[in-house]
From Swiss-Prot:
Belongs to the NUP210 family. This is Nuclear pore complex protein GP210. PANTHER family: NUCLEAR PORE MEMBRANE GLYCOPROTEIN 210, NUCLEAR PORE MEMBRANE GLYCOPROTEIN GP210-RELATED. Part of the nuclear pore complex (NPC). The NPC has an eight-fold symmetrical structure comprising a central transport channel and two rings, the cytoplasmic and nuclear rings, to which eight filaments are attached. The cytoplasmic filaments have loose ends, while the nuclear filaments are joined in a distal ring, forming a nuclear basket. NPCs are highly dynamic in configuration and composition, and can be devided in 3 subcomplexes, the NUP62 subcomplex, the NUP107-160 subcomplex and the NUP93 subcomplex, containing approximately 30 different nucleoporin proteins. SUPFAM superfamilies: Invasin/intimin cell-adhesion fragments. It is a single-pass membrane protein. One of its GO terms (biological process) is mRNA transport. The gene is GB210. It comes from Arabidopsis thaliana. It holds the Pfam family Ig_GP210_16th. InterPro entries: Big_2, Ig_GP210_15th, Ig_GP210_16th, Invasin/intimin_cell_adhesion, NUP210-like, NUP210_Ig1, NUP210_Ig2, NUP210_Ig7. Residues 1-22 form the signal peptide.
Length: 1923
């Protein structure tokens, strides 16, 4: 153990030592610690002493000889440098010191300053030789007599002179002014150039002098001081000017032995290198070692003689000693390497490409040129390139090849690249070949030579090229992009000798714009232009590039490749493409396929497979169309036209905050559908020997393809369906074509006449001659605008002109139907065409008898009127006769007659025979009818006259129940009948009672199924029969037919209709409902089921009819469903409907006063809310106008009535609310305050008002508020919200200063303007007198006095123990602290009356104006103190005040939420400690469309939420007393987030814009970059140094600003707890967020104790926090208490995008310095709660129940035995952490059991178990036995517990004295004397307020001022363990 401890201690020492050393290194610094300055002179000398890493305060010793001027940075808060200047004349050498004190760390740095006179000066320079046209900087330095250099000469005046050395007049140097020189002083940080330039401008010189070389030679430079009496001090130097020389080739030069080459000499003239022509008269050449090389002295020609190193020197003879040299190395070669580089067609080397050596594979591109260089190297491993001369033997082979050609360099480039060692390769075609190069050289002796050889393989490849789909192959790709949509496109590339996709490398110039995969698939990332580059892996120079532009789609158009109309029942194809802003079409855009939404304006056109029509893509490509972005197939269900619309809508700011745009593209196309073109017969042949058709039936149900006409007749036909005329821009065609076989003119045989005058689609077809013809009708639209494909339909019609081959008679039919004609023509006939089977008809009526012509094919003629008929009756004398009168009235044709039947039975024969041609056609068609045709053109039928039997109803649906009965009625026939059922297992016939045998028949159901009841009338011959269908079924469904949502006014009733039926849709008769056991099930008692006869309560009563009534009892929304019992015992349930009970609607406000030009948003309180709409109207629009949103605009003075009408979903009026509005001009104004008095030091808001209204009525129209106070010694304005520009000065706050009365006055002007209707301006002035009540002369108890309302019981304000809660003894219910009320014992009445009393930890009050003090006694120590005093007062004032709302103005972002705390004050403006539920308050605003207000019962806060941009005034008042009101102006709009942050140095903070309508773009700025820096584009800020500054955002029409405070270091640290945070099963002490402090001036008080701090949670709606300190450990925490799920459901603003978890932060800040703060973030996972009992008791009468959950509904629910219970979700409102769900529990088995339902939340592990008990009532004995056993177990457990408690109490009593002995002493330095605490039990209320800070200050001050009070062993603590 000891070694471990020693190691640990040693480690701590090392760490502390490391920290100390790091602090020494990182402290503040200054630039100099010793400074030498001259004394005061005519021109003062200044020196800047620069500091760093600190903020300094400057001081110095001798203020008479030295002046120190601090310099501050741009924020003027910190000094980092100071200017030093001597201020005393010279009187000997002096010494002083300057001290730089870092105000942050307190570190002091001392700088010694010496002041002495000059002894000498000296010119300092870097070189005495300078180049021609070059610059040189000369500087004067001064020294004292000890040769110490002076620190600065800036400010002194000097005289500089230039003089040729030889004494001539030609100067070799020229002076360059400082302002024209390139010198800088770094902005004053590295020099004093500004002062030196000013000296030169004034005509003298400074200590700095710049010269320029102008001519080769020597120049004298002299300087002397221009300061009396030191003008004799001077200095002089000589400078040399020469030309700068350079040699080529550059030194060092490596050559082979025997090489010969010449140098090129260049000189700098005018800063431009120029070659010198050799030989030159001014230059001579020489070599240092002539055995290695020799050089020509005039022209510089050099030859290498032997291996070695030497130097060639060239000298300028004009300047002595001016030479330039070049090193020559004569070497032997080691390697020969070939290099290849791309060569441009213009003859230039592509410099950005790197040459490839022969050690690599060479790949070249066909069609390109390359530079091949042969290079020789020597000296491994540090190889040096050898300079190749003309004498070197180097060769290149392989010049001629099928794949390339090699040529020499042009002459003008040979000098640059080398004629001998460079070639140009022209690649011709792909292939593989070789190049060979050799070098022959001397190996060291002139006699022997050696050869170097290199062979290089070259492959010629095709150029890498993109293959684009565009027609011109323009190397540009255009891709669309929107957030979260990344369009992809595969790029096709060829060339590069590639064999696989891996032989290419892909690059993109900007990966943030475009990404590219290894397979060439590009993906758009954001808008912009990027270049995609594909490179061959073999040759990096073989590449291709394509420009890819990514842009946001600007428009969307339909592709014009498909028909726009088609036949009903088929499909239309459509496709869209998108275009960029410039109109260019995107190369590919199919990634938007799923985002583009298709819809039509009609339900007749159905979108099918809008995103998967891939076949259409191939069709579009084959059409050479633009690439489609989305495709759709539209099914045409019915005719008509509609607009097909494709939309692409997307918001940007949800994905990227930097984007402010949104995309909303639409493309429309008119499409249509038409019925198939058909021909319909329009003229009726019913009266003319033809068939009948129903003109009234649907046009699509009847068409004709064949017509049979007798010559001379006609028929009208109509074209049905087909395309309608599209529009005027599209040609419409409608024609008829005739097809025939022979060449005869058709017009003589059949005539088609278009009936234009009647209807455009009507044709008359007349038959002229015999024959068969075919007509083709064409109708449709051709090509045109918006009609790209023709749509022409056709219909065929065959016309047969012939004579009938037979005729048939139609008997007792109102018309000649085709089916009747067909049946009659196919009937059996006897000779003479007499129909064998008689036709039975009922007697006693007039029947119609008609004849129809039949063709040889058995088809009925359409018209046979050319032929005439003869009618005959046989054996009908007593039975029937022709009714000529009736016949003449009903018809004029001979092809139909009317026969009157007598009331007799028997047989009668009717015959019709064609007798010839009608007289009107005889002249033209007399020869049509052949001779002898009468024998075939005849028909006869026998009529059987009888009475008819009928059974009604013919169908009956019967509920399967033994008690059900079916009654059938019979009419006609005789009374002798027999009934037979074909399935006796379904139903049986019951004989009716006596007297009803002839008219009724009864059936009873026996089983499920269908049966036919046949009734035979045996009284007629032959017997007649009638049929009825009976279906016996069980009920399959029951439905509420009154709708799924019903709204009922409170107190009224509503009737609900029912339907029952079976699966095929048939319904039961209401008479059978009583057999179905129909029950009504209502969720709760909001509504009740009442009987039809009376409004008595009958919940759960059976319904025996098809409707029932419900009565509305309470407000709210509930659900209702009905059930019916099947014969099998099962139940069928109807749909669940919502029933809303609403209160009578009321217009809010019901009466309102406004001034002209003002507006107010009215709302409806009460009324229905489900599927309703509200329409607002005013009676007089000249007085006020109102919008649909309810916004009322006052226009001109007057009165009007406002109606708010509520409509249902079908447009029916449900209810109406009425209000009134008065518009007027107030004559006077008044000033309003909530009280006439205010206490000294307290505040009260005041505002103007009118007698007829308040601020809500006029504040928007008034401005120029001017507030004055008559006597500012009595009152002052402390926090004015006046802002003239924003017209927000209507509220001010006054504070009492001293006793007295004074007048407060306001003046303002109002512009009552209603555009175009009313305009007037007025000025108002109002005042009031306020009294200021002074404090009492002695009121030390005022700060510790709690103000409470009368007759009030507070929360647990009085803690009963001083111990932390976790240390309290859980077994003791007695606290350590005892409280009592101090009373006046002299008055017995006052003593006995408890005006203020204590109840547990609460304080109870009675009457007002009572004061009492509470005494606290610690029973363990015996200490007695005054805990607090209580004053009882009436609530007189109300405020919306908090630290976040100091000036009655709030800035709120759109969607942002804020809690407005509501506080109460007495008549003097003193706040109440508590006043929960004492009075009611009302919160109102004039613009509810701008802000949403929500108040929660029993919570002293109002919650507001920004809805849209604008301003709204919020008023809070006590009840309806408008004088007791406070106002807050809310401005909803865009804001910088976060607002007014406080961060610490070195930290980062991301600013953003919230609450904007659209995503905004702009730039960020900071007003002080030394405090904080901010990224201009992103808004990311970094804290640099301590201070305050402003961050500004500037966008399009938007400028926002916020203040930023930067603190030095983190002073408060807040950590998050490690456990999972949820709002269910919260620890009793809450969740602990540890708070740690850094020991600095912000966090430590003068006595060393931790300062108090505040805690706050954001967002506030999820819970609350309070600070807490553990007195044992000294640790501090923010305790977080989340609200329960029930609280969140009722208090939160519900939105659909809420999640089951909420991210929140806990902030801690110092009370003394709120800027010093810290925060920690955490995640709260919502839990759930089950509303209702924890045990479900179910019985057979109600075998279902509902389980309701609130909170997080992402739960798993199951039971142990799934065979007994079924659990199903019936409703779920998924609102995240505040959701709501309902589950239905059904019992599946009718047997007694118990089970358990388990509900689990996987996110938190929360489990809730619910016991289920199903009791059938069958067994009571067993349950009683079980109950006895359980009771015995409980009694036994209680007995054991009681005995254990008794034993434990005795043990505790014995231990108490021991612990109490140590409670009397306190020792500050001995831990052994610390007493053992006795714990008491304290229950803290969750909303217990803190002890007021004034009271705590009073306690501290009392302790500090108490004489002889020992503080050593005491520590201050809060009795409530709170800060």
């Amino acid at each position: 153990m000891v070694p471990v401890s020693f190691c640990f201690f040693f480690l701590l020492l090392l760490l502390s030592a490391g920290e100390s050393s790091s602090q020494l290194v990182s402290g503040p610094h200054i630039t100099d610690v010793n400074i030498l300055l001259p004394p005061k002179m005519k021109n003062p000398v200044e020196y800047r002493l620069q500091g760093s890493d600190g903020c300094f305060k400057w001081s110095w010793d001798h203020h008479d000889i030295l002046s120190v001027t601090p310099e501050f940075n741009s924020s003027s808060h910190c000094s980092t440098s100071a200017r030093l200047r001597s201020i005393s004349p010279y009187s000997g050498r002096k010494e002083t010191a300057v001290y730089a004190t870092d105000i942050q760390t307190g570190m002091v740095i001392r700088c010694k300053v010496f002041i002495d006179n000059f002894s000498r000066i000296q010119i300092f320079h870097n070189s005495i030789k300078l180049d021609l046209d070059g610059l040189s900087m000369l500087r004067v330095r001064a020294f004292d007599n000890e040769d110490n250099e002076f620190s600065s000469l800036v400010g002194l005046q000097f005289i500089w002179k230039l003089m040729p050395e030889s004494g001539g007049s030609t100067h070799h140097l020229a002076h360059v002014p400082l302002k024209e020189s390139p010198l800088t002083d770094c902005g004053g940080l590295c020099g004093y150039l500004d002062i030196q330039k000013k000296l030169e401008d004034s005509g003298v010189f400074a200590d700095l002098f710049v010269v320029k070389g102008t001519k080769i030679g020597h120049e004298k430079v002299s300087v002397h001081l221009l300061e009396a009496p030191l003008t004799h001090i001077a200095d002089e130097i000589v400078l040399t000017v020469a030309e700068a020389m350079s040699l080529e080739p550059r030194s060092p030069v490596y050559v082979l032995m025997g090489a010969s080459f010449g140098y090129t000499l260049k000189v700098m003239r005018g800063n431009v290198p120029q070659a010198v022509d050799l030989p030159s008269p001014h230059h001579r050449w020489s070599v240092l070692n002539s055995s290695v090389a020799q050089v020509d002295s005039l022209i510089g020609l050099t030859k290498a003689l032997s291996l070695g190193v030497t130097t060639v020197v060239v000298e300028d003879t004009r300047v002595a000693g001016h030479i330039q040299g070049s090193s020559i190395n004569v070497v032997t070669p080691d390697t020969l390497i070939l290099y290849i580089s791309p060569w441009s067609m213009s003859g230039d080397l592509i410099t950005e490409s790197k040459p490839f050596p022969s050690s690599m594979h060479w790949y070249v591109v066909s069609g390109r040129q390359y530079l091949i260089q042969m290079k020789i190297f020597s000296g491994r491993p540090d190889a040096h390139e050898i300079y190749i001369t003309e004498t070197d033997d180097i060769k290149l082979y392989g010049k001629d090849s099928d794949y390339w050609k090699i040529v020499s360099l042009p002459d003008e480039l040979s000098s640059e690249y080398g004629q001998r060692n460079s070639r140009i390769l022209n690649a011709i075609s792909p292939g593989l070949g070789e190049l060979t190069s050799t070098l022959t050289y001397f190996s060291g002796h002139q006699e022997s030579k050696e050869v170097l050889k290199v062979v290089q393989e070259i492959r010629v490849c095709e150029k890498v090229q993109f293959t684009l789909n565009s027609e011109d192959d323009t190397p540009k790709v255009l891709l669309p992009w929107t957030p979260a949509v990344y369009q992809e496109m595969e790029l096709i590339v060829t060339g590069g000798c590639a064999k696989a996709s891996s032989d290419y490398k892909w690059f993109t110039s900007d990966i943030s714009i475009l990404s590219v995969s290894a397979y060439g698939i590009i993906q758009a990332k954001r808008p912009g232009i990027a270049t995609v580059k594909v490179v061959s892996t073999f040759d990096s120079q073989n590449f291709d590039e394509v420009i890819v532009e990514v842009s946001i789609p600007s428009s969307m158009v339909m592709l014009q490749n498909f028909p726009v109309e088609t036949v009903v029942g088929s499909h239309l194809k459509a496709a869209v493409t998108m275009k960029a802003l410039n109109g260019a079409t995107f190369s590919r855009c199919d990634a938007f396929n799923s985002l583009i939404k298709w819809k039509t304006g009609s339900e007749s056109f159905v979108i099918v497979n809008a995103t998967s029509e891939m076949m259409m893509l191939d069709e579009l490509r084959s059409m050479d169309s633009s690439p489609p972005c989305s495709r759709a197939s539209i099914y045409t269900a019915s005719t008509g036209r509609t607009v097909l619309q494709a939309t692409l809508a997307k918001e940007f700011h949800y994905f990227d905050k930097s984007l402010s745009e949104s995309i909303d593209l639409k493309a429309t196309l008119t499409i249509g559908a038409y019925l198939p073109l058909s021909v319909r017969q329009d003229s009726d042949g019913n009266h003319h020997g033809g068939y009948w058709f129903d003109k009234a039936q649907e046009e699509t149900d009847f068409g004709v393809s064949k017509l049979y006409l007798v010559p001379g007749t006609y028929v009208d036909v109509m074209l049905l369906g087909g395309p309608e005329r599209w529009d005027d821009n599209v040609e419409f065609t409608e024609t008829v074509k005739t097809l025939y076989e022979d060449e005869e003119d058709l017009t003589s045989r059949v005539n088609v006449h278009h009936e234009v005058d009647r209807r455009a689609n009507m044709y008359r077809i007349s038959c002229q001659k015999l024959g068969s013809y075919k007509l083709v009708f064409l109708r449709g639209n051709l090509l045109g605008i918006d009609h790209p494909v023709p749509a022409v339909a056709e219909a065929l019609l065959s016309v047969h002109c012939s004579l009938p081959s037979s005729v048939v008679l139609i008997v007792d039919e109102p018309v000649n139907k085709l089916d009747v004609i067909r049946a009659a023509s196919q009937a059996d006939r006897a000779p003479g065409r007499l129909r064998v089977t008689p036709v039975t008809v009922a007697n006693g009526q007039i029947i119609r008898v008609a004849a129809v012509g039949i063709s040889e094919f058995g088809e009925a003629f359409s018209n046979s009127s050319t032929l005439s008929l003869r009618w005959e009756l046989t054996s009908c004398n007593n039975l029937a006769y022709w009714d000529d009168d009736y016949n003449s009235k009903m018809t004029k044709s001979g092809w139909e007659r009317f026969l009157a039947l007598r009331n007799e039975s028997g047989l009668c024969t009717v015959r019709a025979t064609v007798s010839g041609i009608d007289y009107s056609f005889k002249s033209q068609y007399s020869t049509l009818l052949p001779q002898g045709s009468e024998s075939t053109l005849t028909d006869a039928v026998r009529l059987q006259l009888v009475s008819t039997l009928r059974v009604t109803p013919e169908f009956n649906l019967v509920f399967f129940n033994p008690n059900a009965k079916v009654n059938l009625s019979m009419t006609g026939g005789s009374c002798l009948w027999e009934a037979v059922v074909n399935n006796s297992r379904v139903a049986e016939v019951i004989r009716p009672p006596s007297g009803l045998q002839c008219s009724q028949m009864m059936l009873s159901p026996k089983g499920l199924g269908t049966t036919i009841v046949t009734v035979y009338d045996i009284g007629v011959s032959p017997p007649l029969s009638a049929l009825a269908l009976i279906k016996v079924a069980d009920v399959d469904w029951i439905k509420i037919a009154s709708g799924d949502e019903i709204s009922i006014m409170e107190g009224s009733t509503h009737s609900i209709d029912l339907l029952t039926g079976i699966d095929d849709g048939m319904t039961f008769d209401s008479s059978q409902y009583s057999l179905m056991d129909i029950m009504v099930h209502i969720e709760d008692d909001l509504v009740e089921h009442v009987t039809v006869d009376e409004d008595s309560l009958s919940v759960g009563e059976h319904v025996a009819t098809s409707s029932f009534k419900i009565a509305a009892r309470r407000l709210g929304i509930t659900t209702l469903y009905v059930s019916a019992r099947q014969q099998s015992g099962g139940k069928v349930l109807s749909q669940t409907i919502k029933v809303e009970v609403y209160s009578p609607p009321r217009l809010h406000p019901q009466g309102i006063f406004l001034v002209p030009g003002a507006s107010y948003v009215l709302t409806i309180e009460g009324g229905p809310t489900m599927n309703v709409s509200v329409d607002y109207t005013t009676v007089d629009n000249e007085v006020a106008k109102i919008e649909k949103s309810g916004r009322l605009y006052a226009t001109s003075p007057g009165n009007t009535t406002i109606y708010a009408t509520i409509y249902g979903s079908e447009g029916a009026v449900i209810c109406q609310a009425i209000g009134n509005a008065e518009v007027g001009l107030p004559a006077t104004a008044m000033l309003v305050a909530q009280s006439d008095t205010v206490a000294v030091g307290h505040e009260m808001p005041v505002s103007p008002s009118f007698p007829e209204g308040d601020l809500l009525s006029f504040y928007e129209l008034c401005s120029a508020y001017k507030w004055t106070i008559e006597d500012e010694k009595v009152l002052i304005f402390i926090a004015s919200s006046i802002n003239v520009e924003e017209n927000a000065g209507f509220v001010n706050v006054v504070q009492g200063r001293s006793a007295g009365k004074t007048r407060v006055t306001i003046a303002f002007s109002c512009d009552f303007v209603s555009p175009g209707l009313y305009s007037e301006s007025r000025t108002y002035e109002a005042s009031m007198i306020l009294s200021v009540v002074p404090d009492l002369p002695l009121s030390l108890g005022a700060p510790m006095t709690w103000v409470l309302p009368p007759f009030y019981t507070s929360s647990g304000l009085l803690p009963s123990s001083s111990e932390p809660q976790k240390h309290r003894d859980g077994q003791s219910h007695r606290g350590n602290i005892v409280y009592s009320i101090l009373k006046d014992c002299s008055s017995r009445a006052d003593f006995e009356r408890d005006t203020i009393s204590i109840n547990g930890g609460s304080v109870k009050t009675t009457d007002s104006n009572n004061v009492a003090c509470i005494q606290a006694k610690d029973r363990t120590s015996g200490r007695i103190e005054i805990a607090a005093c209580v004053r009882v007062a009436e609530v007189a004032q109300i405020r919306m005040k908090s630290e976040g709302i100091p000036f009655h103005v709030i800035d709120l972002a759109v969607g942002g939420e804020l809690e407005l705390p509501i506080n109460y004050y007495d008549t003097l403006g003193i706040p109440f400690l508590e006043a929960h539920g004492v009075t009611t308050y009302n919160v109102e605003t004039n613009h509810r469309d701008v802000v949403f207000i929500k108040t929660v019962n029993d919570q002293p806060s109002a919650y507001i939420k920004g809805i849209k941009h604008g301003k709204a005034l919020i008023r809070v008042s006590i009840g309806d007393n408008l004088r007791k009101s406070d106002y807050v102006l809310v401005s909803v709009g865009a804001h910088i987030f976060p607002q007014n942050p406080v961060i610490h140095t070195g930290n980062l903070l991301n600013f953003s814009i919230t609450g904007a309508d659209n995503e905004v773009t702009g730039q960020w700025f900071t007003s002080n970059r030394s405090v904080i820096s901010v990224n201009v584009a992103s808004g990311q800020a970094k804290a640099i140094s301590q201070g305050s500054t402003h961050v500004t955002f500037k966008g399009h029409g938007l400028k926002l600003q916020t203040k930023v405070t930067v603190l030095f270091g983190n002073t408060i640290y807040v950590d998050s707890p490690g456990e999972t945070l949820t709002n269910v099963h919260v620890p009793a002490e809450g969740y602990k967020f540890p708070v740690k402090f850094r020991e600095n001036k912000f966090a430590v008080t003068e006595h060393g104790n931790k300062a108090t701090f505040n805690c706050q949670v954001d967002p506030p709606f999820i819970g609350y926090t309070k600070p807490w300190m553990d007195l044992d450990t000294g640790n501090t925490y923010c305790l977080f208490f989340p609200y329960s799920p029930e609280h969140l459901v009722h208090s939160m603003s519900i939105t659909k995008d809420m999640k089951p978890h909420v991210s929140f932060s806990v902030d801690a800040s110092l009370k003394e310095a709120r800027r010093v703060s810290g925060s920690a973030s955490a995640l709260l996972i919502g839990g759930f709660s089950v509303t209702g009992p924890d045990k479900l008791n179910i019985n057979p009468d109600s075998n279902t129940t509902i389980i309701s959950l609130v909170g997080n509904t992402d739960v798993q629910i199951h039971c142990r035995n799934k065979g007994r219970l079924s659990i199903s979700l019936i409703k779920r409102d998924d609102f995240g952490i505040a959701g709501h769900a309902q589950y239905k529990v059904n019992v599946l088995r009718s047997e007694q059991f118990t089970d358990r339902i388990i509900i689990t939340l996987p996110a938190t592990g929360q489990i809730v178990e619910i016991d289920v008990c199903y009791d059938t009532g069958e067994s009571l004995v067993a349950s009683s036995k079980d109950g006895y056993s359980v009771l015995l177990k409980i009694l036994w457990g209680v007995l054991v517990l009681v005995v254990s408690v008794i034993i434990l109490m005795k043990v505790i009593d014995r231990q108490v004295p021991t612990g109490a002995t140590g409670t009397a002493t306190y020792s500050g330095n001995a831990a052994q004397g610390t007493p053992e605490r006795r714990s008491g039990t304290v229950i803290y209320h969750e909303e217990s307020p803190r002890t007021p800070s004034p009271f705590m200050e009073y306690v501290k001050r009392t302790v500090d001022e108490t004489p002889y009070y020992r503080r050593e062993g005491r520590r201050r603590f809060n009795p409530q363990n709170t800060m």
